[in-house]
Amino acid sequence: MILVGRYASPFVRRVGVVLHTLGTPFEHKGLSTATDLAAIKGYNPIARVPALMLDNGENLMESAAIIDSILDMTPGQTLLPATGAARRQVLQHCAIMCSGLDKAIQYIYEPRRRPAEKVHQPVLDGLAEQITASLTMLEALAAKGTFQGGAQANLADITVAVGWFFLHKGLPQIAVASQFPNLVALSARCETLPAFQACQLEG
């Protein structure tokens, strides 16, 4: 397998962490959407990351679809329950974080990709509100002990921990550590795991 994209992307990183957690061998090509679009299009014509090339040459895109496929190919995996309410719960917790991450990337791109006079502050304010709502929901869940982290981490733990690390690093004015202490603690438990250590952000 070949995983395409930089670990600076939380979506690429969560796929990498899942692969390492499962012990699935793969090659990582840290291609950037900023500088390597032509190469990325060889794996995904839409030029989005992550992309995953399977050993049979099939190309997969979008982190949720990639992870679902990986788990389906891994008998006995424990990251995501097979059926029922427990499965829905894990997927919903992932969805909350991924929704916040989608808005965070829009927030980061808005001032970078527009001339200063065309950046609309109400848009940024609305995105910040949505990111905060995502984190507030997850902090409340974490306070109830929903996320275990550590050696017992499931897909939601991985996704939330990866997402918090990205948000706190990239948008510390929104992902304020003192406001989300349980997410900070979850991240700390997870970042020491070998699978997380193997997917360090590029410089």
Cite the ranges covered by each PLM segment.
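GST-like fold's C-terminal all-alpha helical module
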Residues: 97-188
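Non-transmembrane alpha-helical segments in soluble domains
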Residues: 67, 71, 91-94, 135, ...
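Charged/polar, low-hydrophobicity segments characteristic of intrinsically disordered regions
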Residues: 131-132, 191-203
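GST-like domain detector, emphasizing the conserved glutathione-binding G-site
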Residues: 1-122
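Conserved G/P- and acidic residue-centered "switch" motifs that form tight phosphate/ATP-binding loops
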Residues: 9, 157, 193
